[in-house]
From Swiss-Prot:
The keyword Lipid biosynthesis does not apply. Residues 221-457 form the Peptidase M12B domain. It comes from Mus musculus (Mouse). The chain crosses the membrane at residues 674-694. This is Disintegrin and metalloproteinase domain-containing protein 10.
C-alpha cells in the first residue's frame, strides 16, 4: 500500500513541475524556464550606465540562474548598429530618439560567449550565445496572458524551438511560379545613362586611381539599411523602444552571421541601420501610408516597398505582423552580378509596367499560421532573404545540400542557410552559408559593393542619439531645433556639446524643457497605460523615470485581463478567485463558447464554463467576455477570428480538410447508426428509387430508336422541332410505247 502512495505523490510532484518547466509557450517553443530577477535593480543600473562617466560604470551587470547554469552578463551600450546618419521617423516627424537601451556584451569568464539585447523597464530581452548553444529571453506576457506568474520573463534554448516551414510551400520563399515572375520582371529594367555601366567610368580613371580605389574598397564592407515597420508590427510590440529593440536584434543576428563568413577574400561584411520609419497605429488610416490596408498579399506587399525610391540605401526592408498565405515569412529580390536588376545597391529605374521601382528590397513577417514565431526563426528568415539580395539563389546539388546526403556523417551536419526548405535550426550548418552561396555572393559583392557600401566605423555626432563622448545630439543644422545643444555642423570640440549655461537638452530625454532646464517634479513625461501610471519627471534628470504600477487586479485589455505587477498579464477570472480554463469542443461545449473567456473553480476542471453562463452570472453580471481576435482557442488547436469563431489551424490546406471530412471514420459510423435506427425510411427510399427508375425507363422507351423492325418507330419527344424539306418538282415518268407496238416495230426491223 505504501509503494502506490509514493508513486502517486511522485507523479503529482512531477505534474506540478510541468506547469513551469515542461509546458510549451506556443506551438514553436517546446520548453522554457521563468526569470524573476529584480527589475527595479536592473533599471537603476541601466540609468546609471546611461549617465556613466567612469569606465566601470558604463557596464551593465546582470546575474541570474536558469537551465541548470549561472549567467553572469557583462554588457555595454551598443552603438555599432546605427550609422552616422541614423534617423527615426514616425507620422512624418523626425524623432530625437535615444538608443541607449540597446546593449551588447558577453558572459563573464566564458570565452567566445556573446549577448545582445535591450533593457526596457528593467527587463532584458535578447539572445545569449554560449558554448552550449544560444538562449533567448523574452517578456513572459508575450506568450502567457492568462494567469499570475512568479516570473516576468521567459528563457528558452534554440534546441527547444520547433521550426515552421518558414519559407512557404515546398520550403521556398514563395512557390516557383512567383520566383519565375520576379526573375522575368527583373530582366525588363531600363538603365539610365552612365548608371548602366559604372565599371567603364572606373576603368577610364587609369591604373593608379584604380589601385587606390581597390585599396579603399578593402574597407568598404558595410551595407546600410532602411527599415520600415507597419502599424501591425507596432501594434504587436506596443512601443517605439520595443520596435527599435526588435530591429536591433534582427540586424545584430545577421551581422554576426555575415561578419564571420569569408566571401572569397571579402571579409567582415557588416550592417548598419541608416534610417527607421515606424508606422504607428495612428498611421493605419493615413492615405499616404502604402501599408495601411489589412489584407495585402506577400507579392503586393513587396511591390509596395519597391515602389518607393531607395537609392540612398544598400537594402530597404519592411517588417510586419501579417499572416501571409501558405505560411510565407519572407520575400526578396534576388541579386545578380549582371544581366538583371535587383539585390544590393540597386537603384530606382523604369520597368516594363511603366513604373519606377527599387528592387533592393525585401519583407519580413513575424506571424505564421496564426501564431507568432520565435525571434530565432525570424532572424534566420532575415538572413535568408538578405542572402537572396546578396545574389544567392536556393542551395542545390550534393555539394551544397549535405542534409540530403546518404552519408550519415554529412547528413548529421544539416543544410545551410539558403537551403530551399525548412531546417531544424540546431545543426552545425544551419547558421552558415554553403560554398554555392559563397561563390554567388562573392561575385555580386565584387561587382556591386562599390556602388553603395560604406566604411565601417562608430556612429558620430548628428544621428540624434546621445552616445559616448556626447553631451547631447540634436542632429545637423537643418534638423536641430533646440537652443541648448551645438549641432553636428559645428567644429570639433564644440559639436554635440551643451551650450554654455545650459542644464540639459531635449535630445537627452523628455524631462528637459525647450529652455534647457530640467522639468519640475510634477510634470508628466509619459502617458498612463492600462497597468502603469503616468510617468513624472524627478526634477534632476532629462530621462523619464519608470512609471509606478497600478493596483493588482485592475481591469485591462478591454476587461479581458487584469494587471499583475504593472503588466497586463493575468486573467479576468483571477479577479474573482477563479482560474481561467479552455472551453474545448472535446468537453462538449457549444462551438460558440470556444472564443469566450471561460473560468473554473480552482482545482475543479468540471466547473469550467463561459463567463456568460448562469454559473458565473453573479461574478460577471451575465456579461459574456470574449477572447481577442487572434487568441488561441479549443485547447490551442485554433485561433479566434474577428467574428468570434474558432478557426482550426490546418497547415495542409482545404484539400486536406475535405479529405478528412470525406474519409472520417466518424462520418461512416454516424451513417451506419442512422440506418439502423431508421431502417423503415431506408426501405421506403429504396422502393421509391426502384419505382422512379422503372417509370423513367417506361416513359423514355417509346422515344428510343430500336433496330428491331417488328417494333413501331419511336415517337418524337414533345416540343421537338421538325425540319421542313423544300418542295421538290414532280417529274413525269418517260412515256413508253405499248408492248405490241414495240414488238411489231422490232419485228419489222
Amino acid at each position: 500500500m505504501v509503494l502506490p502512495t509514493v508513486l502517486i505523490l511522485l507523479l503529482s510532484w512531477a505534474a506540478g513541475l510541468g506547469g513551469q518547466y515542461g509546458n510549451p509557450l506556443n506551438k514553436y517553443i517546446r520548453h522554457y524556464e521563468g526569470l524573476s530577477y529584480n527589475v527595479d535593480s536592473l533599471h537603476q543600473k541601466h540609468q546609471r550606465a546611461k549617465r556613466a562617466v567612469s569606465h566601470e560604470d558604463q557596464f551593465l551587470l546582470l546575474d541570474f540562474h536558469a537551465h541548470g547554469r549561472q549567467f553572469n552578463l557583462r554588457m555595454k551600450r551598443d552603438t555599432s548598429l546605427f550609422s552616422d546618419e541614423f534617423k527615426v521617423e514616425t507620422s512624418n516627424k523626425v524623432l530625437d530618439y535615444d538608443t541607449s537601451h540597446i546593449y551588447t556584451g558577453h558572459i563573464y569568464g566564458e570565452e567566445g560567449s556573446f549577448s545582445h539585447g535591450s533593457v526596457i523597464d528593467g527587463r532584458f530581452e535578447g539572445f545569449i550565445k554560449t558554448r552550449g548553444g544560444t538562449f533567448y529571453i523574452e517578456p513572459a506576457e508575450r506568450y502567457i496572458k492568462d494567469r499570475i506568474l512568479p516570473f516576468h520573463s521567459v528563457i528558452y534554448h534554440e534546441d527547444d524551438i520547433n521550426y515552421p516551414h518558414k519559407y512557404g510551400p515546398q520550403g521556398g520563399c514563395a512557390d516557383h511560379s512567383v520566383f519565375e515572375r520576379m526573375r522575368k520582371y527583373q530582366m525588363t529594367g531600363v538603365e539610365e545613362g552612365a548608371r548602366a555601366h559604372p565599371e567603364k567610368h572606373a576603368a577610364s580613371s587609369g591604373p593608379e586611381l584604380l589601385r587606390k580605389k581597390r585599396t579603399t574598397l578593402a574597407e568598404r564592407n558595410t551595407c546600410q539599411l532602411y527599415i520600415q515597420t507597419d502599424h501591425l508590427f507596432f501594434k504587436y510590440y506596443g512601443t517605439r523602444e520595443a520596435v527599435i529593440a526588435q530591429i536591433s536584434s534582427h540586424v545584430k543576428a545577421i551581422d554576426t552571421i555575415y561578419q564571420t563568413t569569408d566571401f572569397s577574400g571579402i571579409r567582415n561584411i557588416s550592417f548598419m541601420v541608416k534610417r527607421i520609419r515606424i508606422n504607428t497605429t495612428s498611421d493605419e488610416k493615413d492615405p499616404t501610408n502604402p501599408f495601411r490596408f489589412p489584407n495585402i498579399g506577400v507579392e503586393k506587399f513587396l511591390e509596395l516597398n519597391s515602389e518607393q525610391n531607395h537609392d540612398d540605401y544598400c537594402l530597404a526592408y519592411v517588417f510586419t505582423d501579417r499572416d501571409f498565405d501558405d505560411g510565407v515569412l519572407g520575400l526578396a529580390w534576388v541579386g545578380a552580378p549582371s544581366g538583371s536588376s535587383g539585390g544590393i545597391c540597386e537603384k530606382s529605374k523604369l520597368y516594363s509596367d511603366g513604373k519606377k521601382k527599387s528592387l533592393n528590397t525585401g519583407i519580413i513577417t513575424v506571424q505564421n499560421y496564426g501564431s507568432h514565431v520565435p525571434p530565432k526563426v525570424s532572424h534566420i528568415t532575415f538572413a535568408h532573404e538578405v542572402g537572396h539580395n546578396f545574389g544567392s539563389p536556393h542551395d542545390s546539388g550534393t555539394e551544397c545540400t549535405p542534409g540530403e546526403s546518404k552519408n550519415l556523417g554529412q547528413k548529421e551536419n544539416g543544410n545551410y542557410i539558403m537551403y530551399a526548405r525548412a531546417t531544424s535550426g540546431d545543426k552545425l550548418n544551419n547558421n552558415k552559408f554553403s560554398l554555392c552561396s559563397i561563390r554567388n555572393i562573392s561575385q555580386v559583392l565584387e561587382k556591386k559593393r562599390n556602388n553603395c557600401f560604406v566604411e565601417s566605423g562608430q556612429p558620430i555626432c548628428g544621428n540624434g542619439m546621445v552616445e559616448q563622448g556626447e553631451e547631447c545630439d540634436c542632429g545637423y543644422s537643418d534638423q536641430c531645433k533646440d537652443d541648448c545643444c551645438f549641432d553636428a555642423n559645428q567644429p570639433e570640440g564644440k559639436k554635440c556639446k551643451l551650450k554654455p549655461g545650459k542644464q540639459c537638452s531635449p535630445s537627452q530625454g523628455p524631462c528637459c524643457t525647450a529652455q534647457c532646464a530640467f522639468k519640475s517634479k510634477s510634470e508628466k513625461c509619459r502617458d498612463d497605460s492600462d497597468c502603469a501610471k503616468e510617468g513624472i519627471c524627478n526634477g534632476f534628470t532629462a530621462l523619464c523615470p519608470a512609471s509606478d504600477p497600478k493596483p493588482n487586479f485592475t481591469d485591462c485589455n478591454r476587461h479581458t485581463q487584469v494587471c499583475i505587477n504593472g503588466q497586463c498579464a493575468g486573467s479576468i477570472c483571477e479577479k474573482y478567485d477563479l482560474e481561467e480554463c479552455t472551453c474545448a469542443s472535446s468537453d462538449g461545449k457549444d462551438d460558440k463558447e470556444l472564443c469566450h473567456v471561460c473560468c473554473m473553480k480552482k482545482m475543479a476542471p468540471s466547473t469550467c464554463a463561459s463567463t456568460g453562463s448562469l454559473q458565473w452570472s453573479k461574478q460577471f453580471s451575465g456579461r459574456t467576455i470574449t477572447l481577442q481576435p487572434g487568441s488561441p482557442c479549443n485547447d490551442f488547436r485554433g485561433y479566434c477570428d474577428v467574428f468570434m469563431r474558432c478557426r482550426l489551424v490546418d497547415a495542409d490546406g482545404p484539400l486536406a480538410r475535405l479529405k478528412k471530412a470525406i474519409f472520417s471514420p466518424q462520418l461512416y459510423e454516424n451513417i451506419a447508426e442512422w440506418i439502423v435506427a431508421h431502417w423503415w425510411a431506408v426501405l421506403l427510399m429504396g422502393i421509391a428509387l426502384i419505382m422512379l427508375m422503372a417509370g423513367f425507363i417506361k416513359i423514355c422507351s417509346v422515344h428510343t430508336p430500336s433496330s428491331n423492325p417488328k417494333l413501331p418507330p419511336p415517337k418524337p419527344l414533345p416540343g421537338t422541332l421538325k425540319r421542313r424539306r423544300p418542295p421538290q418538282p414532280i417529274q413525269q415518268p418517260p412515256r413508253q410505247r405499248p408492248r405490241e407496238s414495240y414488238q411489231m416495230g422490232h419485228m419489222r426491223r
